[in-house]
A protein has these predicted regions:
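Generic structural signal for well-ordered alpha-helices
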Residues: 92, 128-133, 166, 170
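Loop/turn elements at helix/coil->beta-strand transitions in domains of secreted/extracellular proteins
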Residues: 49-51, 73-74, 99-104, 139-143, ...
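Catalytic nucleophile-elbow at a beta strand-turn-alpha helix junction centered on a G-D-S/GDSL motif
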Residues: 50-65, 83
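N-terminal secretory targeting modules
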Residues: 1-54, 68, 226-230
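Oxyanion-hole/transition-state-stabilizing segment in secreted/luminal serine hydrolases
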Residues: 60-74, 88-125, 145, 149-153
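Active-site segments of SGNH/GDSL-like serine hydrolases
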Residues: 107-113, 133-164, 186
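Catalytic His-Asp segment of secreted/periplasmic serine-dependent ester chemistry enzymes
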Residues: 151-230
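Alpha-helix N-cap and loop-to-helix initiation/capping positions
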Residues: 119-127, 157-164
Length: 230
């Protein structure tokens, strides 16, 4: 049985990660032009209210077949390369609020990448909590899906930290109503427990056509399971 935090508990938890800590960081402000492009799209194009909003980092942006792969669902695609939860959180209202939709699907994988400025798994989970709170201010009951961070060859050296962050986010999802964790890990690991190189392009980070085919099947199955009961 899923046990849910009351909203006031969520508010208290996320208060330790204020937006102001990140809003003025140059690496966050650098995405302003990308967000403005999304806003121009929102002005110039209309979307059906039953659409699924896919938002996050480059794996969302580069998903060229997303419209076909997600049929019969209508799709709104809002991905920008290099997104981290620390900047997505700042821009979440501008990305998500314009779109009353059937569900929101998020994939962000760059907060732990083997860099000096990596966040800890706990920090990643706190940023997810804050992002979820921002979404819930506008869309209290809209299903929110978090796609687990993929085990990739290029970031295998930090997989223990990524896996820990995944586990923390999974726990958060299990305790919040209408919030779902899409676990993709086992589909991208071989029988030896290593990432399947054949599912990635040459950078060994982003999915190739076969990788997206697996991703889309998992994600659509989760959407079908949840939304058919709504």
């Amino acid at each position: 049985m899923r046990r849910y935090f009351p909203l006031i508990t969520l508010i208290l938890i996320v208060s330790c990660a204020p937006l102001s800590k990140y809003q003025e960081l140059p690496e966050v402000k650098a995405w302003e032009s990308d967000i403005e492009k999304f806003e121009q799209l929102d002005i110039s194009k209309s979307y059906p209210s039953d659409a699924i909003l896919f938002a996050g980092s480059s794996s969302i942006r580069l998903w060229s077949t997303i419209g076909k792969d997600m049929l019969p669902y209508n799709v709104i695609q809002r991905g920008y390369g290099g997104a981290k939860l620390s900047d997505f959180m700042v821009y979440a209202d501008r990305i998500i609020y314009p779109h009353p939709c059937q569900a929101i699907v998020i994939f962000i994988a760059n907060d732990i990448a083997g860099n000096d400025d990596d966040k800890s798994p706990l920090e990643v989970s706190q940023l997810f909590k804050k992002t979820l709170y921002i979404i819930r201010r506008k869309f209290k009951d809209t299903p929110v899906f978090w796609i687990s961070i993929t085990p990739t060859p290029s970031r295998w050296h930090v997989w223990p930290e990524i896996k820990e962050a995944n586990g923390m986010i999974k726990e958060i999802c299990s305790k919040n109503k209408n919030t779902y964790y899409i676990d993709t890990e086992k589909y991208f690991l071989s029988s030896s427990g290593l990432p399947k190189n054949e599912l990635f392009v040459t950078d060994k980070l982003h999915l190739n056509e076969d990788g997206y085919a697996i991703w889309s099947k998992i994600i659509k199955n989760e959407l079908n399971t949840v939304l058919k009961n709504k």
